[in-house]
């Protein structure tokens, strides 16, 4: 058996451990629905385990393109038993924001200071940046992201880029210290949808563990 780690993606009647990020890849690992139900696994879980690798000379199963998961070691960094007892996101209580995220960082960065003054952001708040093209939306997002990682290191930062240029993704990965999840414009629309959905599910699983997530 070979060790494996990734994000669980649950589809209609089967599941996969995405081993190369949030998008489907050739080295994904098949997980039976029986194993998912038995261990209380949920879509967006970060799992580790072992995969069965065909022996040398053994004919690969033509019907099963992906190697199956044969052992489950941990779910979201904890034991499988702990994962079974965790709360469900849908049953948690939504509250108005009551903890502020301070975005001011340095005297050179005026954008985040202006946001602090005009439209303060708190934990649990939704915000929208509306502007014409080439006005600097990406720069504002990078400034906000870097301010959160600096002033609120307890927050898990997720930056999801959908239908973006590949160079924009590289720029974001280099300038932001959080988790950058991307589906570039050369990928099919179905990939954009699945990346966005899986990223939301991942955020929910982190919240169930009591973590603060900013996305």
List PLM regions with ranges.
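Phosphate-binding/switch loop-helix module in NTP-utilizing enzymes
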Residues: 194-215
């Amino acid at each position: 058996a070979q060790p494996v780690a990734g994000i669980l993606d649950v589809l209609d009647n089967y599941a996969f451990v995405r081993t190369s990020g949030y998008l489907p890849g050739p080295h994904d690992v098949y997980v039976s629905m029986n194993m998912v139900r038995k261990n209380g696994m949920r879509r967006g879980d970060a799992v580790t385990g072992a995969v069965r690798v065909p022996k040398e000379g053994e004919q690969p199963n033509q019907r099963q393109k992906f190697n199956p998961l044969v052992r489950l070691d941990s779910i979201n960094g904890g034991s499988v038993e702990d994962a079974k007892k965790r709360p469900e996101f849908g049953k948690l209580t939504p509250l108005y924001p009551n903890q502020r995220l301070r975005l001011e960082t340095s005297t050179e960065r005026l954008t985040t200071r202006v946001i602090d003054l005009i439209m303060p952001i708190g934990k649990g708040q939704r915000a929208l940046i509306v502007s014409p093209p080439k006005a600097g939306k990406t720069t504002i997002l990078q400034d906000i992201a870097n301010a959160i990682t600096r002033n609120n290191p307890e927050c898990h930062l997720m930056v999801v880029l959908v239908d973006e240029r590949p160079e924009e993704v590289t720029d974001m990965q280099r300038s932001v210290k959080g988790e950058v999840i991307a589906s570039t414009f050369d990928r099919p629309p179905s990939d954009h949808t699945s990346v966005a959905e899986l990223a939301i599910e991942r955020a929910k699983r982190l919240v169930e563990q009591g973590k603060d997530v900013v996305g």
